[in-house]
């Protein structure tokens, strides 16, 4: 399918079929389309609303072009969001990754710099002293040795450079916000994935089912008139799509279900990377309050989908224990030290 044919179909609000989407996405990844065409196509998809088939096909191609990280572990899990929720919260999923790793999960965290938020996962980790410039082998060793590794997306999705300038200039959520969390280079089949719109909960859960995921929770936190979060929220109810044992369930949860008080969205916002890093450290130091509560919920879900807990409630308890014991704080120290020792050549790589 030519990009012009695809654009015509999108203007008519018609779906691009699987094989056609594969072809179109490969053209983008190979740099065969102009920025104008890429912009028109991803905007057209957004306006039409992306289907399960379109998203799954695009994710399949991105996975083909990604540099792989080789890790074999049933506990391997990713925790991330699509971004684009415009809520300006601190880095919740990044903080939750340290807590989940401290509870026994093997976290293959995948993310980048801020595109449509105040601080991306890469921004805050860099501010905390983590070395982002690591090879696939080094990251695999991080995951094996300390239970946590961070894959800086631009280093693993080099073909995305052809769409990067378009995405940055548009500055709005597009197909690529959805694709990032679906294209973990370590191939994590367990995942907590936050989405920026409630309609995407069911869609993305079905995409992950089609892509062969094992246990996932796709979530959208509802915050009333203030929009929503691509996280489990403490400011209202959270819509959940859970894939487990090949079956999909959709339900809602509230902070009160786990003995927590609901809180306003302002209590979990950060104005910049420095404030986000400060909040992350405070949580790992067991400072009580809404920021810690929202991390407990999201870390608990990560622990649950990783197979370390039998239920979300048990996952939250394990997350609390990981913070109280100091184990979560130690994970941050370990990642900073280990990633920088590797960079200096002080760690022998497998």
UniProtKB/Swiss-Prot annotation:
Binding site for Mg(2+) 1: 93, 231
Residues engaged in binding 5-phospho-alpha-D-ribose 1-diphosphate: 81, 84-85, 89, 91-94, 109-117, 121
Enzyme class name: transferase
UniProt cofactor note: Binds 2 magnesium ions per monomer.
EC number per UniProt: 2.4.2.18
InterPro entries: Anthranilate_Pribosyl_Tfrase, Glycosyl_Trfase_fam3, Glycosyl_Trfase_fam3_N_dom, Glycosyl_Trfase_fam3_N_dom_sf, Nuc_phospho_transferase
Protein family per UniProt: Belongs to the anthranilate phosphoribosyltransferase family.
Protein name as catalogued: Anthranilate phosphoribosyltransferase
Organism this protein belongs to: Nitrosospira multiformis (strain ATCC 25196 / NCIMB 11849 / C 71)
């Amino acid at each position: 399918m030519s990009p012009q044919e695809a654009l015509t179909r999108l203007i008519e609000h018609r779906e691009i079929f699987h094989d056609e989407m594969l072809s179109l996405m490969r053209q983008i990844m190979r740099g065969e389309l102009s920025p104008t065409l890429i912009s028109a196509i991803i905007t057209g998809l957004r306006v039409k609303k992306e289907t399960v088939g379109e998203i799954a096909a695009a994710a399949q191609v991105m996975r083909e072009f990604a540099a792989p990280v080789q890790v074999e572990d049933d506990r391997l899990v990713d925790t991330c969001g699509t971004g684009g929720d415009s809520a300006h919260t601190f880095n919740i999923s990044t903080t939750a990754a340290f807590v989940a790793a401290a509870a026994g999960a093997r976290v293959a965290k995948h993310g980048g710099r801020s595109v449509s938020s105040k601080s991306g996962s890469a921004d805050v980790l860099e501010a905390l002293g983590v070395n982002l410039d690591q090879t696939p082998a080094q990251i695999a060793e991080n995951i094996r040795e300390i239970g946590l590794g961070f894959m800086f997306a631009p280093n693993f999705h080099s073909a995305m450079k052809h769409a990067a300038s378009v995405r940055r200039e548009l500055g709005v959520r597009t197909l690529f916000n959805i694709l990032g969390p679906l294209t973990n280079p370590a191939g994590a089949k367990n995942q907590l994935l936050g989405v920026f719109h409630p309609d995407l909960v069911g869609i993305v859960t079905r995409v992950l089912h089609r892509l062969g995921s094992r246990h996932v929770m796709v979530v959208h936190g509802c915050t009333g008139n203030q929009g929503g979060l691509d996280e489990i929220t403490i400011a209202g109810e959270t819509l959940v799509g859970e894939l487990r044992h090949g079956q999909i369930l959709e339900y809602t949860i509230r902070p009160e279900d786990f003995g927590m008080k609901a809180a306003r969205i302002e209590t979990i916002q950060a104005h910049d990377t420095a404030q986000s890093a400060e909040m992350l450290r405070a949580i790992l130091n067991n400072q009580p309050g809404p920021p810690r509560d929202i991390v407990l919920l999201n870390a608990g879900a990560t622990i649950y989908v990783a197979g370390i807990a039998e239920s979300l409630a048990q996952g939250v308890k394990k997350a609390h224990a990981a913070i109280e014991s100091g184990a979560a704080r130690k994970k941050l120290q370990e990642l900073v030290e280990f990633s920088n020792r590797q960079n200096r050549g002080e760690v022998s790589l497998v």
